[in-house]
Amino acid sequence: MSQSDXRSGXKAREEALEQWVEERKKKRIAEKELRRINKKIKKLEDENPWLGNVVGMLRKKKDEEGGPPAKRARREDMEIDSTPGRKSKARGFTDQERRDHRRRKALENKKKQLAGGGKNLSXEEEEELRRLARDDDERERRVAGPRPGGVNPMXGPPRGAPGGGFVPSLQGVPESPFSRTGEGIDIRGTQQFPWYGFTPPPPGYYWVPGCTQQ
């Protein structure tokens, strides 16, 4: 290979290297701009829940045009679960409180990921995480008690069971004779038949309701 061929080959490599470096620089700038745009879009959607409906309509239109199926838009309103024994955890929370809770979970996940690499959150993020955790605990205590009104009166102690349940009074409801230990069926050998206003027969006589005494 002649010296001119070697120079032309080196020049071509230099040009290719310069183009590669320039394109990678453009790529980094574009990725940084894309991340900034995505964060701004996310913030707008969090502050304006109604935008989720617009996103859903756009995705539905795209699906009708033959595009790939997209994920469902996140619902900001409370999901109703009809399963017995379960209650919604979103009871009494505002949109801002839900955003704070999601921010706390995101910071906790970030802290775990950084801890895996031997790193820590910044001092500002640590302080924010402590504040959000403290606010979350206060909210949990706020909604854990029984609701005012309804079963529980507005003033005075609650009438229901701890946690807001209601134990109704059994006044006027006939009791089962098999569970009574007062004047009822002689289940312990210390009582007699409940006469309820009838005069008991003399000792040695037994009377059964519906039958004629002998």
Swiss-Prot record:
Region (Disordered): 43-185
Cysteine methyl ester PTM positions: 211
GO biological process: symbiont entry into host cell; viral penetration into host nucleus
Location relative to the cell: Virion; Host nucleus, Host nucleolus
RNAPII-binding: region residues: 129-194
Family, similarity comment: Belongs to the hepatitis delta antigen family.
Placement of sequence motif Nuclear localization signal: 65-74
Region annotation (Dimerization) ranges: 12-59
Key words of the record: Acetylation, Host nucleus, Lipoprotein, Methylation, Phosphoprotein, Prenylation, RNA-binding, Viral penetration into host nucleus, Virion, Virus entry into host cell
Domain HDAg: 20-194
Annotated region (RNA-binding), positions in chain: 96-106, 135-145
GO cellular component, one term: host cell nucleolus
GO molecular function, one term: RNA binding
Gene3D superfamilies tied to this protein: Delta antigen, N-terminal
Omega-N-methylated arginine sites (modified residues): 13
Regions of compositional bias (Basic and acidic residues) in chain numbering: 128-143
Post-translational events: Prenylated by host farnesyl-transferase in the cytoplasm prior to nucleus translocation. Phosphorylated at serines by host CK2 and other kinases. phosphorylation does not seem to be important for its function.
Keyword Magnesium: no
PROSITE patterns named in the record: HDAG (PS51838)
Quaternary structure and interacting proteins, as annotated: Homodimer. Homooctamer. Interacts with HBV HBsAg. May interact with clathrin to induce virion budding.
Name of this protein: Large delta antigen
Domain of life: Viruses
Record propeptide residues: 212-214
